[in-house]
Regions:
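Surface-exposed loop/turn motifs in large extracellular/passenger domains
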Residues: 1-72, 78-194, 198-205
């Protein structure tokens, strides 16, 4: 039930070091801010966590509505194990009438984010055929980590692709075939929108 839901880490709609060959569907609605104990990630696909893992997902569909979420939303899964490979086919994300929030700390801002694809790091490979992100009346705020108060109504960041989080000497690879982003709604508030992906971390040069 709603009263028993609490999220303190990542949510994966897929498997652990094992993919789902048929379609994955994740539906979230009427979630509230107090269900999230810390800022995490909501992944539509599977997680590759061990060295050399090979994970293959089919199509992925994510539907989120009427919610207040303190997390990043990622259409694909996550590839973390060294030399692991996580692959997915086509992702469709629809987010409606929802707030996706982040936090601020020492003048650094991490907004809530929507990624059409997944996340890769630690020398892994993430590959996806296509993404399709549709938003309707989506906004977001940031919270001051020191006092928990709203510090900025900056909006949400949207990436049609995924995230390659690199450390120094990290050879992680992120490959996305095509992306599509559609923005609707008079109440939508956006910090930034990118059709592609982001490379971040200490090894992002």
């Amino acid at each position: 039930t709603k009263e028993n839901l609490n999220f303190s880490g990542a949510i994966y709609a897929g498997g652990l070091d094992s993919g789902i060959s048929e379609k994955i569907t994740l539906t979230l609605k009427n979630l509230t801010q107090d269900m999230f104990k810390s800022k995490g990630g909501i992944y539509g696909g599977s997680k590759g966590s061990t060295e050399g893992a090979l994970v293959k997902d089919g199509d992925i569909e994510i539907n989120i509505s009427n919610s207040h979420i303190y997390a990043d939303i990622l259409g694909g899964g996550g590839a973390f194990g060294k030399s692991s490979k996580v692959k997915a086919k086509n992702t469709k994300i629809t987010v409606s009438n929802t707030s996706i929030s982040g936090y601020e700390n020492n003048k650094n801002t991490w907004t809530g984010r929507i990624f059409g694809a997944g996340l890769v790091q630690g020398g892994a490979l993430f590959e996806q055929e296509s993404t399709d992100v549709v938003i309707n009346n989506v906004d977001g705020v940031t919270y001051d980590q020191n006092n928990g108060e709203v510090s900025n109504k900056v909006g949400v960041r949207i990436y049609g692709g995924g995230q390659n989080y690199k450390a120094v000497e990290d050879k992680s690879q992120l490959k996305i075939g095509s992306t599509k982003v559609t923005i609707n709604g008079k109440d939508t508030a956006l910090a930034e929108v990118y059709g592609g992906s982001i490379i971040s971390g200490t090894g992002n040069k």
